[in-house]
Amino acid sequence: MSNKNKKSGGAGNGAAQKQTRQQSHDSQDYSSFKIVLFYCMLIVFLPVVTFFLLKGFVLDRFFSLSEVKVNIASAVGAVVSLHIALGLYIYRAYFGATGSKAVKED
């Protein structure tokens, strides 16, 4: 009878540990999701914003360039900003995740 009491007492403790571990994994997953979402938004919107800022505010107002040259320069600026955003994402993915190691669970 004492074995049953020990097993039932340990099962409750194991369930609490499992729940705590699950909450920890959920927290890590949410943190990873926020990071990936941030970089996705950066990769999508930074080039668009860069293109229109360069075209509308910088190149048209301060330089006397033709419309085609303004569009080309704005597109080049957008491509450069895209490469910067991708480089930041790759750097973060490669070097930034040193603290979270994959742990095998049985």
UniProtKB/Swiss-Prot annotation:
Cellular-component GO terms for this entry: endoplasmic reticulum membrane; endoplasmic reticulum-Golgi intermediate compartment membrane; ER to Golgi transport vesicle membrane
Pfam family membership, one: VMA21
Alphabetized InterPro entries for the sequence: Vma21
Lumenal side: 54-69
Cytoplasmic topology ranges: 1-32, 91-106
Cellular compartments annotated: Endoplasmic reticulum membrane; Endoplasmic reticulum-Golgi intermediate compartment membrane; Cytoplasmic vesicle, COPII-coated vesicle membrane
GO biological process, any: vacuolar proton-transporting V-type ATPase complex assembly
Protein's name according to its UniProt entry: Vacuolar ATPase assembly integral membrane protein VMA21 homolog
Biological source species: Drosophila ananassae
